[in-house]
């Protein structure tokens, strides 16, 4: 039997970037041989084993044949006679279809290294169209590698359009959609994930709420880019520059969903979008099973980002009311995340990317002043029961007045 390092680990090694997961393929072995050498069987649908020492996954070389619809409709065949080339051809992209043996010898039967050097994401074979999940995977790899100059090959993009047109994307479970979206949020360019999905027609199928933003105008005075969809991509890019927090990056992408349902008669104004967006975010998060941590931050950003942009105009009591809604007294780190989203929204406008965002400083100063109010001093002053909270509110408002010179 021969063991090869395969897939992303080989790709990343050749690119000179860190790889955290090693995947191995074993040629010429049977399950019995693996078990005899101390490996532990873990695969349900096909034979995957954990190494006895490092616990890394080792899969027996296999072939796949389409037998039904969707990304699960495959029959797998594994046997000691399956070659490395036969195993690699079933993979999605040429850059993921390379292998390396323990001596460092590279095996590249499908031109992955050439595509790596030319910064091309290209399908290995026409069997690419048999798995609709690959559309999302290619979009994610585009986001992961965009900063290195990678683009999708024209022929591959056409196959992705064919998949989108076929209806096969509807077979993807909500969990798989979220899994790929979630992974894309940790890439250097999460916005590219969305733009590639849109280019092939998949965004309208898997994330129609975001697709609905494209072609919707905003006031040119505030948004030189005009198109809400383009603005959303710009905000997504800015959020990734400002924060590594995945909930922050998610909230930035969905904060303006309400603009997608503004009646055309009201364009380019979107006076109610902070309100109408809440329902859309809730439905989206429910549909694709988004964790509560992501949903809660997105809802707060959606509801209050326009108010935060007007920080200099707000009365101290209004600022305290907003801080209360954020529950910052118990979750102080939340305010920073919300303000980063608002800063990304502010910077995600054509030609205005480098403008300062003093609103964040105003809110942080107000919070620090209000948080300094000592509840023990209120109690010592003789306040009891509900009166303690009322007095605390008054003193917080007064502290903000002093801090902001209002």
UniProtKB/Swiss-Prot annotation:
Query: Which Enzyme Commission number(s) are listed?
Result: 2.7.7.72, 3.1.3.-, 3.1.4.-
Instruction: Tell me which Pfam families the record gives.
Output: HD, PolyA_pol, PolyA_pol_RNAbd
Does the keyword Glycoprotein feature in the UniProt annotation? no
Biological process according to GO: RNA repair; tRNA 3'-terminal CCA addition
Q: What does it catalyze?
A: a tRNA precursor + 2 CTP + ATP = a tRNA with a 3' CCA end + 3 diphosphate; a tRNA with a 3' CCA end + 2 CTP + ATP = a tRNA with a 3' CCACCA end + 3 diphosphate
Q: Give the co-factor note.
A: Magnesium is required for nucleotidyltransferase activity. Nickel for phosphatase activity.
An example Gene Ontology molecular-function term? cyclic-nucleotide phosphodiesterase activity
- Which residues of the sequence carry a binding annotation for ATP? 8, 11, 91, 137, 140
The residues listed in the UniProt record as binding Mg(2+), with positions renumbered to this chain, are 21, 23
Requisite cofactors: Mg(2+); Ni(2+)
Which parts of the sequence bind CTP?
A: 8, 11, 91, 137, 140
List, alphabetically, the SUPFAM superfamilies matched.
Nucleotidyltransferase, Poly A polymerase C-terminal region-like
> Domain of life, per the record?
Bacteria
Alphabetized, the UniProt keywords read:
ATP-binding, Hydrolase, Magnesium, Metal-binding, Multifunctional enzyme, Nickel, Nucleotide-binding, Nucleotidyltransferase, RNA repair, RNA-binding, Transferase, tRNA processing
HD domain boundaries: 228-329
Entry-linked NCBIfam families: PRK10885.1
Q: How is the quaternary structure described? A: Monomer. Can also form homodimers and oligomers.
Role of this protein: Catalyzes the addition and repair of the essential 3'-terminal CCA sequence in tRNAs without using a nucleic acid template. Adds these three nucleotides in the order of C, C, and A to the tRNA nucleotide-73, using CTP and ATP as substrates and producing inorganic pyrophosphate. tRNA 3'-terminal CCA addition is required both for tRNA processing and repair. Also involved in tRNA surveillance by mediating tandem CCA addition to generate a CCACCA at the 3' terminus of unstable tRNAs. While stable tRNAs receive only 3'-terminal CCA, unstable tRNAs are marked with CCACCA and rapidly degraded.
Q: What else is known?
A: A single active site specifically recognizes both ATP and CTP and is responsible for their addition.
Q: Which family does it belong to?
A: Belongs to the tRNA nucleotidyltransferase/poly(A) polymerase family. Bacterial CCA-adding enzyme type 1 subfamily.
List the HAMAP family: CCA_bact_type1, CCA_bact_type2
Q: What is known of its domains?
A: Comprises two domains: an N-terminal domain containing the nucleotidyltransferase activity and a C-terminal HD domain associated with both phosphodiesterase and phosphatase activities.
Q: What is this protein called?
A: Multifunctional CCA protein
- Organism of origin is Vibrio parahaemolyticus serotype O3:K6 (strain RIMD 2210633)
């Amino acid at each position: 039997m021969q063991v090869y390092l395969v897939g992303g680990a080989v790709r990343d090694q050749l690119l000179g970037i860190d790889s955290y997961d090693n995947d191995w393929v074993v040629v010429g072995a049977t399950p019995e041989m693996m078990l005899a050498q101390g490996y532990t069987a873990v695969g349900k649908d096909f034979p995957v084993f954990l190494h006895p020492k490092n616990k890394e996954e080792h899969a027996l070389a296999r072939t796949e044949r389409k037998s039904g619809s969707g990304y699960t409709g495959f029959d797998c065949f594994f046997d000691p006679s399956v070659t490395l080339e036969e195993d690699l051809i079933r993979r999605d992209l040429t850059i993921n279809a390379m292998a390396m043996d323990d001596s460092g010898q590279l095996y590249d039967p499908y031109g992955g290294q050439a595509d790596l050097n030319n910064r091309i994401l290209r399908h290995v074979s026409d069997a690419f169209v048999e798995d609709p999940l690959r559309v999302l995977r290619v979009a994610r790899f585009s986001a992961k590698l965009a900063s290195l100059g990678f683009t999708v090959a024209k022929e591959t993009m056409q196959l992705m359009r064919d998949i989108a047109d076929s209806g096969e994307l509807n077979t993807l479970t909500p969990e798989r959609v979220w899994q790929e979206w979630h992974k894309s949020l940790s890439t250097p360019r999460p916005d590219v994930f969305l733009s590639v999905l849109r280019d092939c027609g998949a965004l309208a199928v898997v994330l129609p709420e975001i697709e609905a933003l494209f072609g919707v105008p905003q006031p040119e005075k505030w948004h030189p880019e005009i198109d809400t969809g383009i603005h959303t991509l710009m905000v997504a890019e800015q959020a990734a520059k400002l924060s590594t927090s995945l909930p922050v990056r998610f909230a930035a992408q969905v904060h303006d969903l309400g603009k997608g349902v503004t009646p055309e008669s009201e364009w380019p104004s979107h006076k109610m979008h902070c309100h109408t967006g809440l329902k859309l975010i809730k439905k989206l998060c429910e549909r694709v099973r988004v964790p509560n941590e992501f949903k809660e931050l997105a809802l707060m950003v959606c509801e209050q980002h326009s108010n935060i942009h007007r920080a200099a105009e707000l009365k101290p009591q209004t600022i305290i009311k907003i801080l209360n809604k954020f529950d910052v007294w118990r979750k102080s780190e939340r305010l920073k995340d919300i303000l980063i989203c608002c800063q990304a929204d502010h910077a995600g406008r054509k030609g205005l990317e480098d403008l300062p965002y003093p609103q964040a400083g105003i809110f942080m100063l107000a919070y620090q002043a209000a948080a300094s109010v000592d509840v023990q001093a209120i109690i010592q002053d003789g306040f009891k029961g509900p009166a303690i909270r009322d007095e605390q509110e008054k003193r917080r408002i007064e502290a903000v007045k002093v801090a902001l010179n209002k």
